[in-house]
Amino acid sequence: QVDGTDFTRYDDDYEVMFFYPLSKHTYGDAVVRITAYEDGCTINVSYELPIDEAMMPDVLTFFNYLNNSRYVGKVMLLDIDGDWYPAYEVFMSINPEDIDAWDRGCVMDYTFNAFYVMQEMTDYLPELEKGETPKNVYAMWLSDVWDE
């Protein structure tokens, strides 16, 4: 562990995990996992705190709407020890054996995008908690996207 960051080696995979504070703490800080595989790298950003299991169907429906929209990666729910964590994940095809050849700017751009997506979700997931339908929350998201 270096400065709060865990570097873990699993068989042929390497994983870096760290926490990053979000400006809105509805679901805690962001948990970032970057896992290098033989043929690429997965960037995954989730929340530190799980959502209520009763919200799971609505969150999945909302995320399915989003996944059919503009995102390069995908928003999902991770099941970790029976708790459900909203997350955004993107896979990059890279060679972890040749770190000098990585486009570090691209890795940083995708990581920043993942932070942005999860930060933005803190505006929409509470609407589902308040009883708003996934379709209406998606319409809110679309309206905000078109206003940007």
Where are these regions (language model features)?
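A short acidic/glycine-rich loop-to-helix N-cap element
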Residues: 94-110
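A conserved amphipathic terminal alpha-helix motif
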Residues: 105-131
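Short, charged/polar, Gly/Pro-enriched secondary-structure boundary elements
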Residues: 24-30, 94-97
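Short, highly charged C-terminal tails/helix-capping segments
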Residues: 124-148
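A short, surface-exposed beta-strand/turn
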Residues: 33-41, 114-115
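Short, internal acidic amphipathic alpha-helical interface segments
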Residues: 42-85, 89
